[in-house]
Amino acid sequence: MVLLPLLGPVWGLSAFSGMDATPLLIATLVLSLVGLLDDLRGLPVVLRLVVQGLCAAWVLSSMDVVPQVALGVGAAVWALGLLWLVGFTNVFNFMDGIDGLAASQAAFVGFASAFLSVRAGAGADLPLLLALAGASSAGFLCWNWPPARLFMGDAGSLPLGFMLAALGLACVLRGLLSIWCLLILWAPFLCDAGVTLLLRTLRGAAILRPHREHAYQRLATALGAHRAVTLGVLAVDLCWLLPLALLAEGRPECAPMAALVALVPLLAGVVVLSLRLPADGANVKVGVCTD
């Protein structure tokens, strides 16, 4: 449902602007179908990753990623692009574990990226696509806000995460956003997913097996409420990360430091929550999340 408002406008926009959005649209639909099958019947992890990799390669090839650069540099850009698209698609999916969190973050990043790319002198295509992604996510949030009545599932989170990753990468490749800005805007998701993956790897746990060990899940269980966590992340987005993203884009020489200021406190917070709060509600007396 979260994707339906996007498809027609995106197709029309691609025809109007001359930008070929067909690979992105088809890849998004394929990933939505794969996610639906995984929701209904379960699919092997390897199959899901192969499909995601093929979709990422097709979309990346349509971006003309490495024009007039040396082959070695081109290969590195391709590898990093594939890693970003496939990796972030799964990060977004991992972070869709409590009511409202993924949809609100998608709305924030969509609108913020659209605004920042317009400030950088972008044409109409990418800002409008980003704004559409933000508006679609905000609309879905009306039903997904805690207590949620509708849920993304893999059928929604995989394609939405992929689309946002692809649009963000396109902005970076066009020079509209810096990599630092992208890291700042997605800092809550990247920090939580990265720390959780590292801790599970160090512990010898199966990193591809479903779990509820993310910091945001631990905190929601400890508080007994999804709404408090979702509102807290939104407050961090608007009061902390958005000003840092504006600084990074307005003063490029300050961008690395702005990213550091954004990431380090969040990384520290995620580590503390992950080490001090139990997963799955173990030894927590407040009960299950109710809102």
Enumerate the language-model features and the residues they cover.
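"…together with the soluble PPM/PP2C metallo-phosphatase catalytic core" -> "…together
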Residues: 1-193
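Extended hydrophobic-aromatic, low-complexity segments
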Residues: 176-180, 197, 208-210, 228-231, ...
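Extracellular/periplasmic helix-loop-helix junctions in multi-pass membrane proteins
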Residues: 242-260
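Alpha-helical transmembrane segments of integral membrane proteins
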Residues: 213, 223-239, 243, 248
